[in-house]
């Protein structure tokens, strides 16, 4: 599984466009892809065809409330899965800064994906790629994304 973070401190440089199009192109090539939206604006979520206001769970629930990441995964109409974001992620740095090992929370959540139990006797196929769309800042969220990448 390759984990890629699309990051830049400057806004408006195409991070979200790159992340969504990369996820879509990989899915089109029959790769199993998970897109993680780590920006409170939720533009990757919206660009993936979802309404960020209607998410049952978001990446904020995973990072701040310890929700297992697989419970926040939603299928998109574009052939890839997403863990969406919304404004619940705003101000998350303050909450994350109070957690132990706050730089590795996303990494631990992704390790849960690798250790997913079998359902109905079938082991779920692991993701070929995880693409992380970062906010335009060097925050604890971006640090989590960088620590979660595969190289």
Describe the residue ranges of each PLM region.
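P-loop NTP-binding core
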Residues: 1-151
């Amino acid at each position: 599984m390759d984990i890629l973070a699309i990051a830049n401190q400057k806004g408006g440089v195409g991070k979200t466009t790159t992340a969504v199009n990369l996820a879509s192109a990989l899915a089109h090539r029959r790769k199993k892809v998970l897109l993680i939206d780590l920006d409170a604006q939720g533009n990757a979520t919206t660009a993936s065809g979802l309404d960020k206001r209607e998410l049952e769970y978001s990446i904020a629930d995973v990072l701040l409330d310890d929700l297992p990441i697989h419970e926040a995964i939603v299928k998109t109409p574009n052939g890839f899965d997403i863990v969406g974001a919304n404004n619940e992620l705003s101000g998350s740095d303050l909450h994350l800064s109070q957690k132990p090992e706050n730089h590795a929370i996303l990494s631990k959540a992704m390790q849960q994906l690798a250790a997913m139990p079998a359902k109905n006797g079938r082991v779920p196929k692991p993701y070929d790629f995880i693409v992380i769309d970062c906010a335009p800042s060097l925050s604890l969220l971006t640090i989590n994304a960088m620590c979660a990448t595969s190289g």
